[in-house]
Amino acid sequence: MKILAKWLALAVLLCTTPAKAALDIVITEGVDAARPIAVMPFVWQGPGAAPQAIADVVMSDLVRSGTFKPLDELGLPQRNIGTVAQFQANSWSSVGAEALVLGTVKPYGTDQYLVSFDLIDLVKAQNQALKGPVSATEFLMDSRQTVISAAQFRQYGHRISDIVYEKLTGIRGAFLTRISYVVVNHTQKAPYQLMVADYDGVNEQMLLRSPEPLMSPTWSPDGRRLAYVSFENKKAEIFVQDLYTQVRTKVSSFPGINGAPAFSPDGKSLAITLSKDGQPEIYIIDIATKAIKRITNHYAIDTEPSWYPDGKSLIFTSERGGRPQIYRVELSSGKVSRETFEGEWNLGGSITPDGRSMIFVNRTNGKFNIARMDLSTRFMQVLTSTRLDESPSVAPNGTMVIYGTTYQGKQVLAAVSTDGRFKARLPAGQGEVKSPSWSPFL
């Protein structure tokens, strides 16, 4: 009990350190093992300079996925081509890439642009070329065109990335998603800031600024709302905020701890931690009616609830076995079972969207790392190699995890692929950033 109590206290204290508002992704591992792909600069078919380089967005997305490695443009056998009609299969025989993305951009009325792109299967194109002349339909994996405004260039670049990623992997892309996190800057009168940004840290927006700590933001399943803990009234309270209307609703303000909110899969309830009856326990609260139901009842601390995708069970962190471990409770029967056994501590768990794995913080030999456990085989893989990792949040397609860690004495955000190959940092230049949460598909 003392160990988990100290961990809970540390979580509060860690919300009192300074931060910055812009995030930059620094890839630290995994690019060399990625699959080679060619992305051509989209050909601008208008006067002057192109409004934006949409291909740069696509290349950056594919690199950050940890799955693909765009080739250097200077080494590509063809230049300044934007359509499949200009593609020459024989020229690409020695490139070694599995696919090619190319496209065009041209003016289409006032502040409107027609963006076209093609996705070519290079392996199939070369194999077919060996047999003689072939039709583009035999190796063209996708071809689309869309009219967008100048303000939509980056967003549509993410959309192209989603299409390319899904066509080549069979997994839905998550490049149009967003992240939320907490920033702290003690040079300001209201140092705590709840932020939302695109998954890559661009288009950052501040939702709330407070003189008191903010923590544990989490997304609703429809991506319209955030739940979080605020100490703005000198005590822990849970709020739900609509991202579009900015309307805030206080959901929980009981005496003692009100913490660790997690939306139910239907978005109608929150699993939360309350200490109003003594020890911290897991409860479910109806957001509309505020009706609560107690889920756990134990003398040890129970905290950090997270839902199974089917909404029938919760996992949570408890010290009921002597040290912090992750347990599962079936909501219909109340049956509790221990889920983790390896290492000294295991805590802060969440189930991947496919329901097959659990992502959590594992402590072994005093080091806190992000780990993944296969729920069928119980095989556990430590994904990170740093020391003070916390607050993992899984991308909605289950391929990446964003989490908090410490780098050069500062708390930053970082990302790791769920197979552990790809790693990146999202450092803040002037302080610290923490408590990340990845949105659902938007």
UniProtKB/Swiss-Prot annotation:
Keyword Cell division among UniProt keywords: yes
Recorded GO cellular component terms are: periplasmic space
**PANTHER family under this entry?**
PROTEIN TOLB, PROTEIN TOLB HOMOLOG
State where it is primarily located: periplasm
Query: Looking at the keywords, is Cell cycle present?
Result: yes
A single GO BP: cell division
Instruction: Provide the leader sequence positions.
Output: 1-21
Q: Where, subcellularly, is it found?
A: Periplasm
For this chain, the family text in UniProt reads:
Belongs to the TolB family.
**SUPFAM superfamilies in the record:** TolB, N-terminal domain, Tricorn protease N-terminal domain
State the protein's name.
Tol-Pal system protein TolB
Query: Which keywords, in A-to-Z order, does the entry hold?
Result: Cell cycle, Cell division, Periplasm, Signal
Oligomeric state and interaction partners are given as: The Tol-Pal system is composed of five core proteins: the inner membrane proteins TolA, TolQ and TolR, the periplasmic protein TolB and the outer membrane protein Pal. They form a network linking the inner and outer membranes and the peptidoglycan layer.
Function as written in the Swiss-Prot or TrEMBL entry: Part of the Tol-Pal system, which plays a role in outer membrane invagination during cell division and is important for maintaining outer membrane integrity.
Query: Where do the TM regions start and end?
Result: none
Q: Which gene encodes it?
A: tolB
Which superkingdom?
Answer: Bacteria
